[in-house]
Design a protein with these regions (language model features):
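Short, Gly/Pro- and small/polar-rich lid/capping loops
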Residues: 1-35
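Flexible C-terminal active-site loop/helix
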Residues: 4-7, 12-16, 305, 326-329, ...
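Glycine-rich, aromatic-flanked loop segments that form ligand/cofactor-binding clefts
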Residues: 107, 118-166
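Catalytic core of soluble alpha/beta enzymes
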Residues: 207-348
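Metal- or metallocofactor-binding catalytic centers and their adjacent structured scaffolds
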Residues: 40-127, 435, 439-446
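Conserved, mostly hydrophobic/aromatic
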Residues: 6, 44, 116, 129, ...
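Active-site mouth loops of central-metabolism enzymes
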Residues: 145-190, 209-210, 237-242, 288, ...
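Catalytic domains of carbohydrate-active enzymes, especially glycoside hydrolases
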Residues: 192-205
Length: 446
């Protein structure tokens, strides 16, 4: 049986609105960007994928067009192999990745071709009448995928009025109103979690740390556990703490936290993987990462040092097939798979659903930023998060339909932006003049 031929490939850069979310790298800008890949085959099907935004990634995708168009959808692995063989490493890519959360290097960790892989799997699934998850690993493992409520500290957008952050104070949706307002205290974080529980049914929560002093962030963690005694509560400071501080903060909370994500990073001449291994020896908590094991080579060293228990293998880092390969290996070794997330539209949400449905064993609840973008749909039929679970689209392929009018609107917004690359330092200047990123200092501690 022959499979359809890819007859066209289009790359559409898009933008959406964001809140003033705080992380170690600074404050999210009013807008985020993504790149959308659209493939069409000679059977009349459309396949789509979504990936990291910015000009670098957009150009990398467009450079692949000649390697994709004219190829049979069924040979998608060969297409990807051809892309890999023709891709040259950027001169600016020093291989460090995001081990210190230098956001300028994220574009080198996210591989553009994985959006093409998603679109090809979408087409192949439609050709075969199978869901995308049936084409990955050992096939579909579940009908819905558990997700967590991703909590963020949010700064006051009124301090950066000229940046024109979106205001949703007139929205009829309680969460939409809340997500644009300042939330920097334990009480505010608990209110955020309660609102998300009511809207999406989340039982499990992760707080993005690296913003305030570690002791202050742990007060919020304890308040969350008190509000949700049966919930799984986690925190991710993105390696902001020293080894000693991480041990001091986490050891008393071994019965409060479910896992700790990237508690510490490189110090005193030792790598992140070595320092995290020492942390694991000192504290009885599972350790997760999306910083020190973002590819197979990094994972090899992480596994050899027993630095982590949970790998948040984002398919935008690992690829869709690669994310499931690592999920299988982790499951065989008695370790745990999950997925990291960045700001994204609902195409990525559908992709998370498909990958999560194919992951074997008992994955940890997946990250998703979708709650911060919910309502900015590019699809006619975005998957829903109900009772804390992401529904897996039932139609063949990715299982969703792109709305071309909404895509065009998002592209117009992108074209109005003065810059297309992520820059978390820009908005920080309105909060702390002359602020500069420091991987060892929470962003509001200067």
């Amino acid at each position: 049986m022959s499979t359809p031929i890819v007859k066209s490939m289009k790359v559409v850069p898009v933008a959406g609105y964001d809140s003033m979310l705080m992380t170690l790298s600074g404050a999210h800008a009013p807008f985020f960007t993504r790149n959308i890949v659209i493939l069409e085959d000679n059977a009349g099907h459309q396949g789509i994928g979504e990936i990291h935004g910015g000009d670098y990634t957009c150009e990398a995708l467009r450079a692949c067009e000649s390697l994709v168009v004219g190829q049979p959808v069924g040979k998608y692995r060969g297409i990807l192999d051809s892309i890999h063989k023709h891709t040259k490493r950027a001169k600016e890519d020093d291989g460090e990745g995001i081990q210190t959360l230098d956001i300028s290097k994220l574009k080198f960790v996210v591989k553009a071709e994985w959006a093409i892989e998603c679109a090809l799997l979408d087409l192949l699934g439609q050709a075969l009448g199978l869901q995308m998850c049936d084409l990955l690993g050992d096939g579909k493992q579940r009908d819905k995928v558990e997700t967590l409520g991703y909590l963020f500290y949010v700064s006051d957008k009124e301090k950066a009025k000229e940046l024109n952050y979106l205001d949703e104070s007139d929205s009829s949706d309680t969460w939409f109103r809340m997500r644009r307002k300042e939330m920097l205290t334990p009480d505010a974080i608990v209110s955020q979690a309660q609102c998300l529980h009511e809207k999406y049914g989340f039982r499990n929560f992760k707080l993005k740390g690296g913003v305030l002093a570690g002791s202050e962030e742990m007060k919020a963690v304890c308040a969350l556990k008190q509000a949700f005694p049966n919930g799984r509560i986690n925190i991710d400071p993105n390696g902001a703490w020293s080894l000693a501080e991480a041990i001091d903060l986490c050891k008393p909370l071994e019965n409060v936290l479910t896992y700790i994500e990237d508690p510490c990073g490189p110090e005193a001449g030792y790598s992140s993987r070595e320092i995290m291994a020492e942390f694991k020896n000192a504290v009885k908590l599972p350790v997760a990462t999306n910083m020190i094991a973002t590819d197979w080579r990094q994972f090899y060293h992480s596994a050899a040092l027993k630095s982590v228990d949970i790998v948040l293998a984002d398919p935008h880092f690992w690829g869709f097939g690669g994310s499931i390969r690592i999920a299988q290996l982790l499951n065989d070794w008695g370790l745990t798979w999950g997925s990291h997330s960045n700001n994204h539209f609902d195409i990525t949400l559908a992709a998370f659903a498909q990958v999560g449905a194919a992951a074997p064993g008992k994955p940890t609840a997946l990250d998703t930023h979708w709650i911060w973008q919910d309502g900015q749909n590019l699809l006619d039929d975005a998957p829903r998060i109900v009772d804390g679970y992401l529904e897996v689209p039932e139609k063949p392929g990715l299982g969703v339909t792109l709305n071309m009018n909404k895509l065009e609107e998002a592209n117009k917004l992108y074209n109005k932006l003065p810059s297309h690359d992520r820059n978390d330092a820009m908005a920080m200047q309105y909060l702390i003049p002359n602020w500069k990123f420091d991987s060892k200092k929470p962003c509001l501690v200067r």
